[in-house]
Amino acid sequence: MQHANTTALYLIGSDESGKGDSFGGIAVSAVLIHKDKINTLHQIGVGDSKQFNDYQIKALVPKIKAAVHDQVTLSVDAKTYNQLVQSFKNVNVMLTFLHCKVYHQLLQQNKLTAQQCDISIDEFANVKLFTQYTQKLTSLQNELKELVIPNHFLIRGESYSKVIAAASILARAAFIAQMEQLSHQYGVQFPKGSAHGIVEALHLLKTKRQFHKFAQYSAVCKTTFKNVASFLKQLA
């Protein structure tokens, strides 16, 4: 954890969803709220997204959007996810890029600087590693002029920070929508997670949708996951 920005008038929280799922890409969200309004998130029932089912998540989305000052969500499909991982050579560098991107958009939309905000992230890397990842990004891309480093890195942050919890719910809602769109497009009920039913679903795509090429699978699943990569080797 870094030092809190005690003079900040605004709080920002960010989290991602889909990171551990074999199918689909990933969604990253950040929310901005005035420090004096943080109790509103408690009043509307914001909590750890893992405690809510999909229906409850969807019901909370409009309430959160109405309660916060602003929010940004990036829904990255599987094809783009795989391209980014290949480009950045490291999943955590890619995650750093996506979190920095939602911070950048949120600050830009509201004409704020990072110094005016107290920023919290659900920790996927500690501050030292996150800083190293931003240094790698500086040499890899020029899209973001400023790479913001959060003030707080919280393990299971959605359990301790309402602003992270709100971002977590928005990210999960976006990932749910992404998975529902995939299922509708391909006529296959894609399993969640990265263990149960994954190989069976990959086989189903082969038999039901005539998937025979790596590029076809890369549009629906994370090709670097071990069980997916093992299956894809059989296509060669």
From Swiss-Prot:
It catalyses: Endonucleolytic cleavage to 5'-phosphomonoester. GO terms for cellular component: cytoplasm; ribonuclease H2 complex. CDD domains: RNase_HII_bacteria_HIII_like. The keyword Nuclease applies. Pfam families: RNase_HII (PF01351). Its EC number is 3.1.26.4. The lineage of its organism: Bacteria, Bacillati, Mycoplasmatota, Mycoplasmoidales, Mycoplasmoidaceae. A divalent metal cation binds at residues 15-16, 122. It comes from the Bacteria. It comes from Mycoplasma pneumoniae (strain ATCC 29342 / M129 / Subtype 1). InterPro entries: RNase_HII/HIII, RNase_HII/HIII_dom, RNaseH-like_sf, RNaseH_sf. Endonuclease that specifically degrades the RNA of RNA-DNA hybrids. One of its GO terms (molecular function) is RNA-DNA hybrid ribonuclease activity. Keywords: Cytoplasm, Endonuclease, Hydrolase, Metal-binding, Nuclease. Residues 9-236 form the RNase H type-2 domain. It is an enzyme of class 3 (hydrolase). This is Ribonuclease HIII. GO terms for biological process: DNA replication, removal of RNA primer; mismatch repair. Manganese or magnesium. Binds 1 divalent metal ion per monomer in the absence of substrate. May bind a second metal ion after substrate binding. Its cofactor is a divalent metal cation. It is found in: Cytoplasm. Belongs to the RNase HII family. RnhC subfamily. Its main location: cytoplasm.
